[in-house]
Regions:
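NAD(P)-dependent dehydrogenase/reductase Rossmann-like domain
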Residues: 1-262
Length: 262
């Protein structure tokens, strides 16, 4: 079920006719269709598999850590670029066993991947706009989130029709705590999570890294889960460092006199 470069290009081109229409999807289609002008074959296969970065993603991740906001998908993207430059990759490929890649129905796979990408894209923007919200509160900026989305719709590499939906969402509810709570985006997340889980499962079983997808799914699962194990973390912190904890049944902060049982 392996896709050729032309098939990948055509897939991106189809996606660029619908709700995923964006500058980056469009030029990705062009890149996979481009022939090499210096040698035989396609130019994509001649480009060294190591990505550079100017620092904006790193700055954003650092600011998010400083403000206590989860933007794990942006950080995962930065880490992937860093890992692509790891000089140990070649040695690892020679000694670490790789699983076999599962066979797939190309048409069904492409549709699941399209849905997974759109779903993950919602989560990525939800993370970033949560960072805007926190920064606005922390620094007294009084940001207009709908206007920010509108600004990105032209003259920017992330320009996409998707941004129109974000503008509409914040025009309806400027104080919305998280983008996924908007009626449109919530509906798309609920309908798309199955495809995202399917693509991630297939990638994991095939040994194919999809860190942004994984972090997007973890983000939404952390958001919707009634318990994430943080009570154990607070218990551990109080046990070794007397950092105190809050209770579900009483107000205030508490420290417990922990006993060693084993």
């Amino acid at each position: 079920g392996k896709f050729t470069n032309r098939e990948i290009s055509e897939t991106f081109h189809r996606w660029n006719q619908g709700e995923l229409k964006s500058f980056l999807i469009g030029i990705a289609a062009d890149i996979f269709a481009e022939e090499d002008d210096l040698a035989d074959g396609d130019i994509i296969d001649k480009i060294v598999d190591a990505a550079g970065q100017k620092g904006t993603g790193r700055w954003t991740s650092l600011e998010a850590l400083k403000l206590g906001v989860n933007i794990s998908m942006i950080t995962a993207a930065c880490n992937t670029r860093v890992s692509s430059n790891d000089t140990g990759r070649k040695a690892a490929q020679e000694v670490i066993a790789a699983p076999s890649v599962a066979a797939v129905d190309k048409e069904k796979f492409a549709e699941d991947l399209r849905t997974a990408l759109y779903t993950a894209k919602i989560m990525a923007y939800a993370q970033v706009f949560s960072l805007y919200r926190k920064a606005s509160e922390e620094y007294g900026w009084d940001l207009n989130y709908g206007a920010i989305a509108s600004i990105f719709r032209a003259g920017c590499i992330i320009q996409a029709v998707f941004l129109n939906k974000i503008t509409e969402a914040y025009e309806k509810n400027p104080s919305m705590k998280n983008l996924v709570f908007d009626e449109f985006f919530l509906s798309r997340v609920n309908s798309g999570l199955g495809s995202l889980r399917k693509i991630i499962s297939l990638a994991v079983l095939s040994g194919i890294p999809v860190p942004a997808f994984v972090n997007g799914l973890e983000y939404i699962d952390l958001l919707r889960s009634p318990s994430v194990g943080a009570n154990l973390i607070q218990g551990l912190r109080d046990y070794f460092g007397a950092h105190t904890f809050k209770r579900i049944d009483k107000e205030g902060s508490f420290h417990h006199d922990w006993k060693q049982h084993y």
